Design a protein with these regions (language model features):
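Active-site and adjacent substrate-binding regions of carbohydrate-active enzymes
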Residues: 1-435, 439-464
Length: 464
């Protein structure tokens, strides 16, 4: 999609029906006696209908345009050659300026059935902002893959024309529990990587972690594709907050809009402890690990943003029924001082698009920089150790199925063990096998004796 103030869209509005400018988007006549009804029943991601009506140049009510997200984001028609050429030039423009890759958002809704038929009715229990996901005429529509194949041709040709450049594209395709569907996006002629969100969408329990990791690993590793993990992103409450809730271990707390709308009480100390363990989990897995800004600081979700300061269109489109995702998008703190947005800006007189909490500076990079027990220190240690772990190869072996509260796997000479239970658990001998502690999620989480070794509750260890 593109901004509704973009020159191309403004030209399309001015050009009138049947113009080549309108063919770059999805303009259609409305239904009803005077075209007063939208062309079909499609729903927008952020609530409401997916169509908005324009006023024609002569001042009369006119055609409707399609917007999968908001009226300020009209959808491009990716079947249009002008659009294809525009993005070819855009990719090369940024590659010429040293950009090495692109993260491509919302790839699952780029394709459209050319006839734009009505979507099937959805169950009444489906949330207003989830109805769009059940539209088979845009979600995972096959024509989108033609666009990504073309992008890959552009990327490959650029590398040929510029020896030494290594470029990467990664897609954001929400396909939880459907690794075979995810594989479509990482075929050799499409994206280099595609986010695996199964861990992000898993509750805090070893059984769920095992199912999510094993399912993704078996599908992508066997296909020769790169596993691409994430625990946080811009669309979900931060993991420190999610893991700090009393129902964090339940799948029901992790489904649908609960990822962004839960207002259950949060135990931040518990959330931090679990988030530290989860960091070792995801950084121990083979493949690529993506860290969301502030994750390495252990930032919690900001839950008390005033309604007047909220920016997420979900909040406005649902008339405040859903708070949206603003709380994970608050500017990251770099310094202890509240000046210059805790170091986020170099300007002395700047207003943030989202207010920072008063204690944000105490969670900053500066406040954690020299603290060997901080979340930042843990990430630095883990990333340093990960360099050697990567040399062990991509093959891992899962130990158990998580029903004992342990999510465990071996990777070469390393072993990763995560205890999601509320009690210390004995580490099986097949995991220990002469190994010792390399790194713990915090001090004191690993103990060993003559006959047994234990991992503390809500903790993780790397052994080797």
């Amino acid at each position: 999609d593109v901004c509704s103030t973009d020159l191309w869209f403004q030209e399309a509005v001015d050009a009138g029906r049947g113009s080549k400018q309108r063919e770059r988007f999805w303009f259609r006549d409305g239904q009803g006696v005077n075209g007063e009804l939208p062309p079909n029943n499609w729903k927008a991601v952020f609530g409401g209908g997916a169509w908005s009506r324009i006023t024609e140049p002569d001042g009369t009510p006119g055609q409707w345009f399609l917007h999968t997200f908001t009226p300020w984001q009209p959808d491009f028609n990716w079947l249009n050659e002008d659009v294809v050429d525009y993005f070819d030039r855009m990719l090369r423009f940024w590659f010429d300026r040293g950009v090495d890759g692109f993260r491509v958002d919302a790839v699952t809704v780029v394709g459209k059935h050319p006839d734009l038929p009505d979507a099937p009715a959805v169950a009444s229990a489906v949330a207003e902002t989830d109805a769009w996901a059940f539209n088979p005429y845009t979600v995972f529509w096959p024509s989108a893959h033609d666009a990504w194949r073309h992008w890959r041709e552009v990327v490959n040709q650029y590398e040929i024309d510029h020896p030494g450049r290594e470029l990467v594209t990664v897609s954001e395709a929400y396909t939880p529990g459907k690794p075979d569907l995810l594989l479509r996006y990482v075929e050799p002629d499409q994206f280099h990587q595609s986010f695996t969100f199964d861990l992000l969408l898993s509750p805090w329990n070893a059984l769920s972690f095992h199912k999510a990791a094993a399912r993704s690993y078996q599908a992508l590793h066997n296909a020769g594709a790169t596993l691409t993990w994430a625990l946080n992103n811009h669309d979900a409450h931060r993991v420190v907050t999610r893991y700090g809730r009393a129902d964090a271990h339940l799948m029901s707390s992790w489904t649908g809009s609960n990822l962004v709308n839960s207002d259950a009480p949060v135990d931040l100390e518990l959330g931090h402890r679990r988030a530290r363990a989860a960091a070792l989990l995801v950084l121990g897995l083979p493949g690529a690990a993506y860290l969301y800004m502030g994750e390495e600081l252990g930032l919690p979700e900001v839950l008390d943003i005033p309604d007047s300061a909220r920016q997420d269109p979900i909040f406005a489109r649902t008339e405040g029924r859903e708070k949206g995702r603003d709380g994970c998008r608050v500017p990251m703190p770099w310094t202890n001082s509240s000046e210059r947005l805790a170091g986020f800006s170099t300007s002395a007189n700047v207003e943030s698009w989202m207010p920072q909490p008063e204690d944000w500076g105490s969670r900053s990079v500066e406040s954690q920089d020299d603290d060997c027990s901080s979340m930042l220190a843990l990430y630095r240690q883990a990333l340093s150790c990960r360099v050697d772990m990567v040399k062990q190869g991509e093959e891992i072996h899962f130990i158990g199925d998580g029903t004992d509260g342990l999510f465990s796997f071996t990777r070469g000479s390393y072993a990763v063990v995560v205890n999601t239970s509320e009690d210390a658990v004995e580490i099986p001998q097949e995991i220990m096998a002469g190994r010792g502690l390399i790194l713990g999620s915090q001090t004191g989480v690993f103990s060993t004796g003559e006959e047994a070794s234990y991992i503390a509750a809500n903790s993780a260890v790397w052994l080797g």
